[in-house]
Structure formats: structure tokens, C-alpha cells
Amino acid sequence: MDGQETSGPGPGYPPYWEADVVLSDGGTAHVRPIRPDDADRLVTFFHRWSAETVYRRFFTVRSELTPAEIERFVNVDHHDRVAILAELGGEMVALARYDRLPDSNEAEVAFVVEDAHQGRGLGSVLLEHLAAAARERGVGSFLAEVLPGNRQMVGVFTDAGYVARREYGDGVVRLSFPIERTELSESVMRSREHRAEARSVERLLVPHSVAVIGASREQGSIGRRLLDNLLIGDFAGEVYAVNAAGGEIGGHTAYRSVCDVPGDVDLALVATPAATVLDVVEDCARKGVKGLVIVSSGFAETGAEGLALQRQVVATARANGMRVVGPNCLGVINTDPEIRLNATLAPASPGRGRVGFFCHAGALGIAILEQVEARGLGLSTFVSAGNRADVSGNDMLQLWQEDPATDVVLLYLESFGNPRKFGRIARRVARRKPVVAVKGARSLTGPPAWLAGSGVRANDTAVDELFRQSGVIRVETLTALFDTAVLLAHQPLPAGRNVAVVGNSAALALLAADACVASGLEVAVSVDVGAEGTAEEFREALGRTLSREDVDAVVTVFVPGLTQPEPDLAGVLSDVTFDATKPVVSTFYGFLGVAAPGSVPSYRSPEAGVQALARAVEYAEWRARPVGHVPDLEVDLSVAHAVLEQALLEQPDGGTLSAEETGRLLASYGIEVLPTVHADSADEAVAAAELAGYPVAVKSTSARLRHRTDIGSVHLDLHDAGSVAAAYEAVAMLGERTVGVQPMASGVATVVGLSDDASFGPLVSFGLAGVATDLLGDVGYRSLPLTDVDAAGLVRSVRAAPLLFGHRGDDPVDVDALEGLLLRLALLADRHPEVVGVELNPVLVATHGISVLSATVRVQPSPPSWDDEARRLG
């Protein structure tokens, strides 16, 4: 192929189409557009096809590609002719392409997957990426011709969630289908993403063989501790020691390289110096290792050079089918008695339990594991991700969603890699099981150094809203995390907010009752068995209280050392609540934890127990709410695309849209802005008012003054020419010679906005208009995607919301129309990443309908975000 190959990606190459992807078996591959220098790879790829694969692709038998075909296949324009390949270990293993038909928005497509990699989901992944590229380039439909016997390829198209039309003729099946995103295609993609990413993490946690690379003879060294912990924990599979010097370590043969290990290696624990890790990863690729846990330090936490090395290590691993935990991490644990994996630096593994735990910090992980043991929690699985260069909390949520061994999920997060994906997955997981999270690094102005390049620090308000919207229980400290976890792991969820207090100390009962009120709970009854109460009296009081229909949960408080020793009361508590359907928490002063699985958690203070209970109540209420959906709204995408494309041609660096552009863009999404006529004199203002019809409003057009009713820059409800002229002169006295004249609209004044948060992407905001709202910060936020339930919650989240619902005898306003506006704005933001800011201020909400009086839209050039278009890691 010498002489035909052109170096480099070629003109128009879209680098943001590149992605690492997870396949259906949990392995990884790299997806990218084809390049002219792929000619040799293409020929080698073709020569690995079976005769059947060749026939299915070309409908004929052939042994070679012609030079003209090769030239055409690798030279594309990335617009009307697009080809996307998947590569593994630097070799092409699958290829998909489309060719647009002349003067059409239809394109013919063709796919081929190498025989050795068929059945791994490569076809469906490439279809997602090819369709995303096609939509970006204005292609609306795909056409494909497939042999009737090629059921796998027919399935790639028909199982993707698209509605395909089939025709039979000339011995082939002709398929045609629109490629617009639909609820079904989105659901199919998310389901495949979930299964693939869960499987990729499962390969790390359920290995049949483990190699410790960097195992050492030196007691206490990192490599030796990893090896010893595997052996002490009685790992169920094969353990191999790898040391460059060879010999023997702890009675085990030490192999000089992982490539020398006689058996297969599923998981490699890497504990070699940072400078050697890339070579180790390449050896693991040659060996066929399925996953890596890199405990070595010296990467992103050390600065720019370490970050560059870390990225190279992860890219090499992913390109060769491997996921990575770390680097700079503590390791992973799986307490399944069939696995018994302690691949960490921690001296002891916690007992078996129903809790899955993910954390960032390596060193902190040891303290966390000690607390887990002290609280009697027990774990199903544990992952310390360190620098979190690859495997993240999102991956673990994918695994834990359907993991029958995990009932409660705990997260200690210091940054987010992909917050939008986190919100989407967490919302799904939290519908099944509680997710409790500590968001650390609040005091930092940026991401922690050890997470440089792999995440960004989110503003705290956005974090709160993301967690609340996703059903994640946010706590401030690790202590609160464990307080909440022991309750959720051992007690049922409360059905309501009514709490009973039962105990032998009036003082403690009062503290518990006060804590309930402070936490938003209702005290239904308080039962005091007295300081001299017996265990049987307590048994009877607790049983009677639990049977009350007006009680949803019970808080028990005890001072030890009275007539009954503490163990007797604890036993009674466990007996009475064994099959209870209501949660019970207790305070035994001097005792913390749980006696056994299913027993009642005990806290050092009533306040701690009540706060944990309150969190469980809020979570149960969230879970009981409808899931909601993103409604299918009618919009004019062609107009929106045209407005934005023209605006960015005129302002290549971005900027604010003109009033005319703003009106057209918003109208394409069903958001009408009340027309405004600008006037530069009193006579022009009167003429504009006569044209609009009285009453009218006259206001300054200055961004500084146009909302300042307090200083005379806004004049409302003007009914005649004289008042309009006077209003113009009043505004002119402020130094503004141009005013806006609008038809008068009425309603409660609100502000709707869209901002592009550096961490979370687009956030939709809502608040009531006015200085008081600004001063109090009474603004609510929601991240995308926005469901109808989210929109309703956003409107009701602000403290001033009662003004919308008939406050003090006023008529309630049209909240449905307001929620519809929020949904349309959210859809605009979701479809057009170029739109980075919108302010609708004010939006008047009347008893029937809404009026948008003023709108500002900011745009900036931005390559499409494919987070929601096609599966990708990162």
C-alpha cells in the first residue's frame, strides 16, 4: 500500500467523534472516524474476514479489495461520506459507513464486523455513532441492503429502537428507517450502556485469576501487602506473583513478566513505579488481561507530566480492551464467599454485608473500611478509585443497579467526571435502592490535584440540586454517611413523617422530640416507661406503639445502668422489631452500631438517630413520586439550526443574539416573546402605543435599568398618549433616549433562566422576580434532562412559590403553562449546546397563560456533546 497512504487525519476530520466504548461483554474498544493512513489497516482487516463475511458485505466472493475501493473507503469528507471504525490493540475490527444520496437527506449505510469480534455489540455501538454523526450533518434516514440470511446485521438495525420498513426484492432485504432520536431508541441505548458498563466492572470484581505485578519480598511493601492480603483473604482463584527478578515470594513462584504466567490472568494488580506502568500495561495487553487495578502513585496528583502519563496509561488500556481502577488507589474488595477478593492495601477486609461502597481517596479508604467494620455494616463490594482516571462512581452505579448482593449504595465523591451521566444513572438506581453520598472538597476552588484532568468541582448549589433531583441522599460528613447507612441497611423505609418516641428517660425523649421537629418530622406520641421500667414493660410499650396506625417510625432512647442492664433492653428491642414493617432507631448511651443484621441501629445521641431517620423519610417520599417523562414537544428544528448557524457565522467567537434572532429561536420551540417596539422620541413612543393598543408599558431598553421599577425606568398600565409621552420623558431623564413600548400584560412576575454550568452542563433556573428574591437567593435549579415531574418540582422549590397558588385569597395562576415553558427551554438546551445562556425576565404568569416580556440568549461555538447521542466512556 505504499504510495496510496496519506499521513494524518485529513481535512475536516472531527476529533470529537472519537470515543472509547464498552462492548456487551465488558471489554473496551476505541471508535473514531476513518483516516487516509488507515489503508494498510483496512487491507489487513479485510484479509481476516471469513468467506461468509466477505459475501455478506459485498454480495459476491472476492479475495482482495481493489486499489480504487481502498482509496474510496479511506478518503471521506466527514459530511456526505462518513466512515467510523472500531479498533482494538491498534487493529481495525469493525467498520461502518454512510454515503448520502444526491440532493437528499437519506444515506446508504454498510457495516462489517470481523468474525472474531462478532456478537460483542460492535455493530450496535457503531450504528449509534454513525447515526449521531449523520444527524449532525443533516441526514434524516438510513437505507441498507442486507442478505436475508444475515440475521445479525438485520438485528443491528431493527433492535436499535428505530422503526424500520422492510422490502424484499432481487434476493436482498431493503431496510429504511428514520434516525431521529426517539424515546424507544434512547431506551435501547441506555439499556445496552447499562449492561455493558456493569459487565465491565464485574470483570474487575469477579476474577478467576489475579496477578500481582510488582510483588516484593520486602515485608510491608506495597506489592507484598497486596499479595499477602489476597492470600490471607483466601482468594478463591489463582494468584500469581510477578517480579522482574523472578525467584520465589512467600512460597509462590515469581514470574519475571506477566507474559510468563502459565495461565490466564483476569485481573492485574499493578504496584510498580509510575515510570514503568505503561510498559506493564502493554505487557498486560499482550497477555490478554481483562482489567487493571493500579495502586502505584506518581500520576495526575504530581502535576502536568504525571497527568499526561496517566492519560497515556488509560488510553493504552482501553485501546486493548481493559478497564482501569486508579491509579493511586487503595484497591477493590468483593466479599462474595465464592470470590473472597481483598485486592487492597487494607490489612483486613470487612465482613459480608449488603452495602456497596465507592470512594476516591486511597488513604482515606483504610479509615472508611475500619468504620464499616466498627459499625457492623458489612460490604458486598468496595472500590477505591484514587485518581479515578477510568472507572468511576457512574460505573459502580451501573453494576449496583441490579446487583442482588447490594441493597444500599454509599459514595464518597471529591469531583464529578460526567455529572449529567451521574444524574441519569443515579436517578434510575435510586428508584430501586438508596444511594447515600458525601460530596467532599467543598473548600477547594477547583478539583483536587489528584483528580486533575479527570473531573471538575461543581458549584455546591448545583450539586445539591443534582442529588435532590436524582433521589441521592446527600450528607455532609462520613459520620452522617454511616449513621444513615446503618438505618437503611437494617430497617424498612418509613411510610410517612409521624414518629413516636419510646424510652426510659424524659430528658432524652424531649431531646429526641425536639430533633424530630427540627428535622421536619411530626411527633405523634411520646411514651415514657420510667427510669425503673422493666424489660417486659418496655416490650409491651414498644409493641403497642409500633401497632398504632398514626405512627410511621419509632425512636427509642435509653440511659443504661438503671433497673435493667443494657443487653436485656437491646435483646427486647431486637425481638420486638424483628418482623416490624416500620423503622426503629435507638440511642443507647455508650453503644454505637448494630448487634446483628436486621437489628436496630443505635446512635450516640438522639439527634444523630433522628437526622438519619429524616433522611430516610425524604428518600422514601422521593421514591413514592411519579417517575415523570420528557414530553414529546412539537418544535421546528430547521429554524433553530438556521438561526444558530447564521448567528455563529456572524459572531464566530459567540455573543448575544439580536432581538430578532432571539424571537425566531425561541418561537421555533414554542416560546413567544411579547413584541416590543423601540422608540427614540415621545412621538414615536405614542405612535407605537397607538399601534399596539392600550394599555401599554414603557420601559428602558438598557440592560442596567430595564427591570428597575423603583427608579422610574419602567412605567406600566398606560392608557393614553399623554401618559405614554410622560413616561418617555421620565425614562429620558435617566439618560436613556430609547425606550421599548409593549402591550400591557398582567400576572405574577417570574424569572426563567438557563445557564451552562462548568460542571453540570445546562441548568434550568426559576424564581420570582424582584429585589427580595435576588437578596435571598430564592432561586431553584434543575439539571437536564428535565421531566414533567422535575418542572413541577422546580416551580414549587422556591420559598415564594405560594404566590403562584392563590396566596391570601388571590386567584391561582396558570402553573401548567409555566411548567410547559420550563420544559421547552430545557429541550432547547438539550438539543443545542451552542446555547449557553438564556434569561426570560420577566415572565408574567396570569390566571390563563403566560407572557414573556423580555428575552436574552447567549451563544458560543461548541462541538455537539454526544453524551446523549451515543455510548462513550468519560
Question: What is each of the regions a protein language model found here?
Answer:
Residues 2-203, 207:
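Long, contiguous binding/interaction regions
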Residues 180-874:
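Catalytic-core regions of core metabolic enzymes
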